[in-house]
């Protein structure tokens, strides 16, 4: 369990804070952050980052989570009709509350987040005081560390840091923090608090999962485990309270992400397509995708994230040295190498072709792109800028 938590924390929590600090080197502008790799590659990478935390993965996942943690436990049964009906209602609400913004959403979000955190803390503390069981004696997977690292991908907290950095910076400016040093200091403090809180919650939930690990197999949905644990610890009332809070939290998250994604798409298309049209398309796609469930969306997202994360991580690291890097090849060569290796790895996992990719170092934990990217970085250092 320790290795799994370490791996998960590294990507889900640690990398999110580092990413936030990295994007501050570019005035919290994601387009400036990716610009060193060239105009077209930068546009593609930034587009994929925004799509992952928006319409492609996270927005549909909010709808699926709202059903699996909010409605399904209350209903007590599940079928295709119920999840379809809930997905339609969920994204209809998302559409109307995004196209016609309401203060109700802000009010719900303001009070709901503290309530949801409090509810999770109560569940975790109760689970620590009265554990439901002992962790399984042997791991059910081959690479516990690798699984933790890859699961950290799925939170996409790193991408969120890059995507919302500009919003956080604007908020600080509106509060009177006009000096860049002040802004960076406050961003670090707020990021540290947020990541620490996330870390404690993730750690607590991991522990709760470990206490029932002997009871469940790998085929059980993660959301179902949380629901079952909550019911065992706090009874039906606790399950219903968590369900309602989860549904509303997912709804406010969906509205915020849909709005931000719509504005981004309007900007990159230079307002050739209406905002409301993008919102409608996002909600329709979210409805269809949410029906496959959280686990299904996670499976779809895994290969996409496996390709998008490595180049993003390299740019995050190099961002701290941008003032000393005079040759863009130092950004481009390792980044393109990471994309290439990651793409081949994903292709191998899907088809069985190009098995040679498994010979590379760190393949067992899914990080065979690191050494080749480092070699590419070293080579780029010796190539003179024309």
PLM feature spans:
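Membrane helical hairpin/interfacial module
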Residues: 2-84, 88, 92-95, 99
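Membrane-water interface regions at transmembrane-helix termini and the short interhelical loops
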Residues: 26-33, 90-112, 174-177, 287-299, ...
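Select transmembrane alpha-helical segments in multipass membrane proteins
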Residues: 39-53, 84-88, 143-151, 232-249, ...
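Hydrophobic, membrane-embedded alpha-helices of multi-pass small-molecule transporters
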Residues: 51-55, 125-132, 141-205, 241-250, ...
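Helix-loop-helix connectors at the membrane interface of multi-pass transporters/channels
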Residues: 64-82, 173-174, 254-281
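Membrane-interface loop-to-helix entry segments
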Residues: 98-127, 301-313, 333-339
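Extracellular/periplasmic helix-exit of transmembrane alpha-helices
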Residues: 196-225
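C-terminal membrane-solvent junction of multi-pass transporters and transport-like membrane proteins
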Residues: 313-378
């Amino acid at each position: 369990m320790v290795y799994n938590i370490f791996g998960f924390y590294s990507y889900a929590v640690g990398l999110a804070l580092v990413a936030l600090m990295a994007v501050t080197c570019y005035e919290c502008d994601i387009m400036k952050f990716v610009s060193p790799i060239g105009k077209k590659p930068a546009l593609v990478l930034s587009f994929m980052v925004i799509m992952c935390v928006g319409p492609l993965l996270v927005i549909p996942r909010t709808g699926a989570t709202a059903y699996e943690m909010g409605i399904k436990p209350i209903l007590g049964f599940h079928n295709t009709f119920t999840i379809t009906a809930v997905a339609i209602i969920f994204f209809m609400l998302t559409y109307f509350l995004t196209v016609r913004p309401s203060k109700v959403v802000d009010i719900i979000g303001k009070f709901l987040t503290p309530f949801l955190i409090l509810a999770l803390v109560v569940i975790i503390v109760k689970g620590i005081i009265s554990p439901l069981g002992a962790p399984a004696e042997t791991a059910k997977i081959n690479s516990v560390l690798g699984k933790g690292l890859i699961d950290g991908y799925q939170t996409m907290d790193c991408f969120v840091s890059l995507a919302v950095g500009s919003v956080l910076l604007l908020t600080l400016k509106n509060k009177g923090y006009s000096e860049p040093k002040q802004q960076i200091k406050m961003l670090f403090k707020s990021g540290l608090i947020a990541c620490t809180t996330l870390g404690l919650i993730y750690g607590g939930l991991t522990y709760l999962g470990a206490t029932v690990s002997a009871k469940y197999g790998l085929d059980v949905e993660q959301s179902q485990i949380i629901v079952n644990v909550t019911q065992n610890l706090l009874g039906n009332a606790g399950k219903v309270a968590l369900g309602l809070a989860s549904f509303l939290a997912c709804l406010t998250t969906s509205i915020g992400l849909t709005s931000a994604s719509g504005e981004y798409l309007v900007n990159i298309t230079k307002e050739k397509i209406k905002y409301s049209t993008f919102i409608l398309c996002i909600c329709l796609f979210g409805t269809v995708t949410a029906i496959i469930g959280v686990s299904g969306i996670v499976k779809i997202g895994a290969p996409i994230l496996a390709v998008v994360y490595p180049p993003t991580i390299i740019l995050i690291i190099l961002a701290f040295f941008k003032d000393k890097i005079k040759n863009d090849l130092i950004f481009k060569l390792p980044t393109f190498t990471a994309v290439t290796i990651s793409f081949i790895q994903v292709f191998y996992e899907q088809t069985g072709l190009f098995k040679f990719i498994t010979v590379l170092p760190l393949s067992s934990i899914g990080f065979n792109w690191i050494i080749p990217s480092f070699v590419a970085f070293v080579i780029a250092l010796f190539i003179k800028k024309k």
